[in-house]
């Protein structure tokens, strides 16, 4: 923008740097609006960008109007649709992805986990350092990690061996220098192996073609028109992709030949064989063999998590369906998440390097803030597990338990008919030959939400809570996070002998998939019957 243009717009627009706009709007709304929040709006065309002498400015009124709509109109719209008030303080809607996945919380993706800030919110208000908390539906260990950060002792139970592996890697103590040395050596060996597979000229030419189309057809102006609903995304993208595929087809004919060199790798593992290209299967298999050769069992588990996380990111699928796989995609596609042409990953190297360094960094960061507290991870069925017997294997923790028993529960049971918890990590179970216990899941998606499924769900959750009560002290506080759209929890609490103290209704704004309908979850605060 030249000086004349600047003079023309200055009287009409109040332009500020993103940093200045963040400070002004935070003060105005009494709610922290960070620089990255405004940068996101600029990046995705929600507000205009003004560039003057290589500095980015925004119109403060435009940004303010966006947040007014977000804070007030959206709240009103959601509450009208749902028919009741929501606890917006629990939305944590302006947290960045980095904050929602701080330190070891971000070591491995896990669909259906709550954010650590939600756990922290309730632990700070209802529990003390030295207390013992139990999570009978541990998942990836969010509650246990947050307890460790706050000096609270914790116990987690999960039916899935892989979930227990994720949690264990988050909570273990490490020799950081040894960890770095072994993991970086494994990374470098994999790089050398991949390099010897040969350069892929096809990928280079494909990327050039994608870049050409994105620069011409999926510009910032296109994103702005989308946000203002001035263009039909489906029809426009379909038309452009038809043109793209004509050129792409010629590239494939020129460069791609039938190459069955790696065709037999993972042929006996149906998920891996279906969702990964031959080259990627070869790279995954090479790193897997390095894991098998690793003699340090603690670090071996970290390497397993790095490979699993890498495998998840290099599946042949679209960015907007990463959480719920539909059909394999190995060619470029229009991406509804990024509003441009994207392509599936062609090699594991970029992700493997990124995740190796990221996991090391997260573990090192957590090692500096973790407190001195006990934790216990139990791979078992929460309906029947004897926590006392498990604690006896850890004498110091058991002595603490004997003197006070368990002070509370903070957990999020499976949501009826929404997630298949084993299937979401099918790649990991096959990679590491981990036994699957799908039939022992409570309320999985594959069983649906029929009357029969609801009855089984009520019995399953009730059995867990009844079993847990045996190990709680009489003043224990219980918090359960769930989306109770079938209104099953009143009966569950009656069966379990629990009294509802309060229900919080938390709006969930940052969802993985394209569904943007109003969605909330309940946080039930409970106590035991006297």
From Swiss-Prot:
The keyword Transferase applies. One of its GO terms (cellular component) is cytoplasm. GO terms for molecular function: DNA binding; methyltransferase activity; N-methyltransferase activity; site-specific DNA-methyltransferase (cytosine-N4-specific) activity. Keywords: DNA-binding, Methyltransferase, Restriction system, S-adenosyl-L-methionine, Transferase. Pfam families: N6_N4_Mtase. One of its GO terms (biological process) is DNA restriction-modification system. It catalyses: a 2'-deoxycytidine in DNA + S-adenosyl-L-methionine = an N(4)-methyl-2'-deoxycytidine in DNA + S-adenosyl-L-homocysteine + H(+). Its EC number is 2.1.1.113. Belongs to the N(4)/N(6)-methyltransferase family. N(4) subfamily. This is Type II methyltransferase M.MjaII. The lineage of its organism: Archaea, Methanobacteriati, Methanobacteriota, Methanomada group, Methanococci. The gene is mjaIIM.
């Amino acid at each position: 923008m030249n000086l004349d243009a600047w003079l023309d717009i200055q009287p009409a627009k109040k332009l500020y740097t993103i940093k200045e706009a963040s400070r002004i709007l935070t003060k105005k709304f009494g709610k922290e609006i960070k620089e990255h929040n405004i940068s996101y709006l600029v990046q995705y065309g929600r507000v205009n960008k003004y560039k003057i002498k290589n500095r980015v400015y925004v119109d403060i009124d435009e940004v303010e109007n966006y947040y007014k709509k977000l804070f007030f109109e959206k709240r009103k719209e959601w509450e009208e649709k749902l028919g009741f008030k929501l606890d917006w303080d629990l939305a944590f809607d302006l947290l960045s992805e980095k904050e929602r996945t701080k330190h070891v919380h971000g070591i491995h993706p896990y669909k259906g986990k709550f954010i650590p800030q939600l756990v922290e919110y309730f632990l700070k208000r209802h529990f003390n350092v030295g207390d013992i908390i139990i999570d009978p539906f541990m998942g990836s260990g969010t509650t246990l990690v947050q307890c460790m950060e706050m000096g609270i002792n914790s116990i987690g139970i999960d039916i899935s061996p892989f979930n227990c592996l994720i949690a264990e890697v988050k909570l273990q103590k490490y020799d950081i220098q040894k960890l770095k040395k072994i993991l970086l050596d494994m990374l470098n060996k994999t790089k050398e192996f991949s390099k010897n597979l040969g350069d892929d000229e096809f990928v280079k030419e494909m990327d050039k073609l994608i870049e050409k189309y994105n620069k011409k057809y999926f510009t910032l102006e296109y994103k702005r028109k989308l946000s203002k609903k001035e263009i039909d995304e489906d029809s426009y993208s379909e038309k452009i992709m038809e043109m793209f595929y004509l050129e792409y087809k010629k590239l494939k004919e020129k460069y791609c030949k039938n190459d069955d060199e790696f065709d037999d790798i993972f042929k006996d593992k149906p998920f891996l064989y279906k969702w990964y290209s031959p080259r990627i299967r070869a790279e995954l298999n090479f790193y897997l063999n390095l894991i098998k050769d690793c003699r340090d069992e603690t670090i071996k588990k970290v390497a397993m998590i790095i490979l699993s996380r890498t495998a998840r990111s290099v599946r042949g699928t679209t960015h907007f369906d990463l959480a719920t796989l539909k059909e394999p995609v190995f060619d470029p596609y229009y991406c509804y998440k990024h509003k441009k042409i994207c392509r599936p990953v062609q090699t594991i190297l970029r992700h493997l390097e990124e995740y190796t360094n990221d996991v090391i960094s997260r573990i090192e960061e957590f090692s500096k803030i973790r407190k001195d507290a006990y934790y216990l991870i139990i791979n078992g069925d929460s309906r029947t597990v004897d926590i006392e017997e498990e604690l006896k294997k850890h004498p110091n923790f058991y002595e603490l338990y004997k003197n006070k028993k368990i002070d509370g529960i903070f957990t999020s049971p499976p949501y009826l008919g929404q997630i298949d918890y084993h299937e979401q990590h099918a790649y990991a179970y096959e990679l590491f030959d981990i036994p699957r216990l799908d039939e022992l899941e409570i309320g999985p998606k594959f069983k649906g939400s029929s009357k029969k499924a609801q009855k089984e769900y009520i019995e399953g959750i009730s059995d867990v809570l009844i079993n847990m009560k045996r190990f709680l002290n009489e003043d224990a506080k219980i918090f359960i996070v769930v989306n109770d759209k079938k209104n099953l929890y009143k009966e569950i609490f009656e069966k379990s002998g629990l009294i509802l103290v309060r229900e919080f209704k938390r709006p969930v704004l940052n969802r993985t998939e394209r569904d943007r309908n109003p969605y909330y979850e309940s946080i039930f605060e409970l106590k035991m019957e006297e």
